[in-house]
């Protein structure tokens, strides 16, 4: 089976050097997902040749960096022989257009003694007797012929990919992963922009929390382009015991700040250059602009919040699409440790609490459980 893979449009806009790097990374990710076969680059697309019974092909729809792909049949058209193309088109498409209104779409790369319109017209005439008619504006079925120099490719399916950038081209980011609805979606969105996520989870719910986090990450692993996901599980109950020493109204923001501080240490360890969270502006009291400012004050790494402008319905819609929603919805909100959280915490108060608590963030990270998925 031969498959033509069309990279995301933005990859084509990169400089020649960056484009080669992105396409090389995409090819490696495809190899990791498909497990076998031959892949090569050619004039802005990738070709993948695999066994006909390869069951991993459908997984290409979850490989970031792919705009679309199509299983194709091909012939070598010597001396620009249009008759060869017409005969092959009849062989491939006669059953596809049978009893249906159809259209032919053709495109060419290279020098030929015929135009794309010639191909569309001649192939359309050859297929017409098998069909119920032609409608270029609203056909029931479209058939495609793509001629690249002396090879013609025939296909009738265009399967959409997730677009974005190949996972790995943008480096690593440490993701604060609670396991709720938001953090898996934020992780997915950063992978879509080419980042490899390093997952940091504060376990506040024991084995149940751990179970659902692992299930969510198993879903996200299918979108990772073959990259393994590294999970660091911190014992959050030890942190909560510490936080019981400060005022209730400051605890939620202080907990988030502890998470940021541990994430900062993990960035150092994992050679990640950013921290990612699932925070959305004003969604809850800890996510007001003031509290976000206090939470990230003094953190040396950039903090990415891909969901910052999303409402909950939009986030839920994405979670359903990704496949994590069914697990996230079963998980209690463990970070809601105070019913009297303030929407505007004072920075000086939090810094004073932080000094008094004197948490050893390095030790918190050292005592974490590490799992590779």
UniProtKB/Swiss-Prot annotation:
Listed under catalytic activity are: [ThiI sulfur-carrier protein]-S-sulfanyl-L-cysteine + a uridine in tRNA + 2 reduced [2Fe-2S]-[ferredoxin] + ATP + H(+) = [ThiI sulfur-carrier protein]-L-cysteine + a 4-thiouridine in tRNA + 2 oxidized [2Fe-2S]-[ferredoxin] + AMP + diphosphate; [ThiS sulfur-carrier protein]-C-terminal Gly-Gly-AMP + S-sulfanyl-L-cysteinyl-[cysteine desulfurase] + AH2 = [ThiS sulfur-carrier protein]-C-terminal-Gly-aminoethanethioate + L-cysteinyl-[cysteine desulfurase] + A + AMP + 2 H(+)
Q: Does the keyword Cytoplasm apply?
A: yes
Q: Cellular component terms, GO, for this chain's entry?
A: cytosol
What InterPro entries does the annotation carry?
Rossmann-like_a/b/a_fold, ThiI_AANH, ThiI_fer, ThiI_N, THUMP_dom, THUMP_ThiI, tRNA_STrfase, tRNA_sulfurtransferase_ThiI
One GO MF term on file is: CCA tRNA nucleotidyltransferase activity
Give the enzyme's EC designation.
2.8.1.4
The residues covered by the THUMP domain are: 54-158
What pathway does this protein act in?
Cofactor biosynthesis; thiamine diphosphate biosynthesis
Return the PROSITE patterns for the record: THUMP
Q: Which domain of life is it from?
A: Archaea
Q: Where does ATP bind?
A: 176-177, 201-202, 256, 278, 287
Sorted alphabetically, the keyword list is:
ATP-binding, Cytoplasm, Nucleotide-binding, RNA-binding, Thiamine biosynthesis, Transferase, tRNA-binding
The role this protein plays is: Catalyzes the ATP-dependent transfer of a sulfur to tRNA to produce 4-thiouridine in position 8 of tRNAs, which functions as a near-UV photosensor. Also catalyzes the transfer of sulfur to the sulfur carrier protein ThiS, forming ThiS-thiocarboxylate. This is a step in the synthesis of thiazole, in the thiamine biosynthesis pathway. The sulfur is donated as persulfide by IscS.
State the protein's name: Probable tRNA sulfurtransferase
Q: Which organism is it from?
A: Saccharolobus islandicus (strain L.S.2.15 / Lassen #1) (Sulfolobus islandicus)
């Amino acid at each position: 089976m031969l498959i033509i893979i069309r990279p995301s449009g933005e990859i084509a806009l990169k400089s020649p050097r960056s484009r080669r790097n992105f396409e090389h990374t995409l090819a490696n990710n495809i190899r990791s997902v498909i497990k076998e076969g031959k892949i090569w680059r050619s004039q802005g697309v990738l070709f993948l040749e695999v066994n006909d019974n390869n069951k991993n092909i459908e997984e290409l729809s979850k490989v970031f960096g792919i705009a679309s792909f199509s299983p194709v049949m091909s012939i070598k058209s010597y001396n620009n022989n249009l008759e060869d193309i017409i005969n092959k088109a009849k062989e491939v498409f006669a059953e596809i257009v049978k009893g249906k209104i159809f259209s032919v779409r053709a495109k060419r790369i290279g020098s030929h003694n015929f135009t794309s319109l010639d191909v569309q017209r001649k192939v359309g005439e050859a297929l017409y007797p098998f069909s119920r008619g032609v409608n270029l504006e609203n056909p029931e079925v479209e058939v495609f012929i793509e001629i690249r120099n002396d090879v013609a490719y025939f296909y009738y399916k265009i399967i959409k990919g997730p677009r974005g950038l190949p996972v790995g081209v943008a480096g690593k980011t440490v993701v604060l992963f609670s396991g709720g609805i938001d953090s898996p979606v934020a992780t997915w969105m950063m992978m879509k922009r080419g980042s490899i996520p390093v997952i940091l989870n504060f376990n506040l719910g024991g084995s149940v929390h751990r179970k659902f986090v692992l299930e969510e990450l198993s879903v996200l692993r299918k979108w990772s382009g073959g990259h393994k996901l590294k999970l660091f599980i911190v014992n959050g109950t030890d942190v909560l015991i510490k936080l019981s020493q400060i005022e209730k109204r400051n605890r939620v923001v202080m907990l988030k700040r502890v998470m940021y501080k541990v994430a900062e240490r993990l960035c150092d360890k994992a050679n990640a250059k950013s921290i990612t969270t699932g925070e959305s502006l004003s969604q809850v009291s800890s996510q007001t602009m003031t509290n976000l400012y206090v939470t990230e004050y003094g953190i040396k790494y950039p903090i990415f919040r891909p969901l910052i402008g999303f409402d909950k319905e939009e986030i839920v819609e994405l979670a359903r699409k990704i496949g994590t929603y069914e697990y996230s919805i079963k998980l209690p909100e463990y970070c809601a440790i105070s019913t009297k959280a303030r929407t505007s915490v004072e920075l000086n108060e939090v810094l004073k609490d932080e000094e008094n608590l004197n948490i050893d963030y390095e030790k918190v990270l050292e005592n974490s459980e590490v799992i590779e998925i």
